[in-house]
Amino acid sequence: MKRIAYPALAFALLALPAWGAAGPFDPAKSPVPPSDGTSTTPGKKPMPELPSPYTKNYTRGAVPPANGQPVDLAYGAYQRGQYVTAFREATKRIEANPKDAAAMTLLGELYNQGLGVKQDPVKAAEWYRLAAAQNDAAAMSSLGLMALDGRGVPKDAKAGRRWLEQATAHGSPTAAYNLGLILIGTGNAADEAAAAAQFRKAADAEIGPAQHDLGVLYLQGRGVPKDPSKAAELFRRGADNGDLASEVEYAILLFNGIGVTKDERSAARYFLHSASRGNAIAQNRIARLYAVGRGVAKNPVEAAAWNLAAAGQGLSDAWLDQTLSGLSADERTRAERLANERIEQR
């Protein structure tokens, strides 16, 4: 693992990009510039229909029985990472009931990811298609993503969109979110409104990235009336659902009192949490707060440690470098140690 070392040379006095801020700013007076939401939305990718095992919502073992149905042993094994068992149980279910759409979808997922079986996107698409014929929304959603990527099926954007529309109509909030990503990418004002409607469906299902993206639209007034208060509420919910981008945006609004009551200490706590989870923007912002003593007690060593962590991810800050240039050799060593310990803990 590459270790971080504090630079010993003179610091170049270059301006840090605003990262979503409008116009110039003085970090000493305003260490957290307002955001228009674009600083946390680079390279958005579609969400898979089935979450990977061991995520926060999928660590409880077998799915509890519903409506008198037996425990779902196949999905339970999948959620625990027992993929061979999941494959065997799903296969047994299909042998007993050739129209078991959920088992077909699970086999498709196992083949798609190469879990418990040799990865085979073509077979995955075949199983998804069989499940989709039984009106399984998750299978439709996965087929849509495969068509968009040309994975296991011919690449076809129109077909991908149709599958996502069908999945959304059958109640998949993940498909609604992915459909919203397609719509927002066209650049048409009408599609922005349609994208907002799809994001709202997913946001209502507590999908964090959808809450973030809908919040950005409210912050910018795209597809919906501009409303920083609604943006703040969506970012807060997204943060509660574990979405780092939402957490950072909510912290920015909290710090500046935009759409929510100004609270620098709470903002600092959100930044610190996101920084600890590896978000470079949060690492930079909490470093600034430690440097000037806003929301947290002034602590140059902590500021330097977080500045190093952000710089290690490509987000340098000439203002921070200059502000912290008077650190002693011992303070620099402590900052390096803290930064490297945090990297190793993630």
Predicted segments, located by residue:
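Bacterial N-terminal signal peptides
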Residues: 8-17
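Terminal, low-structured helical/coil segments at or just beyond the last alpha-helical repeat
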Residues: 48-61, 67, 297-298, 311-346
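Short helix-capping/linker turns of helical repeat alpha-solenoids
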Residues: 63-66, 70, 77-78, 82, ...
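Hydrophobic face of amphipathic alpha-helices that form TPR/SEL1-like repeat modules
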Residues: 70-77, 89-93, 104-113, 144-149, ...
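TPR alpha-solenoid repeat register
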Residues: 103, 139, 175, 210, ...
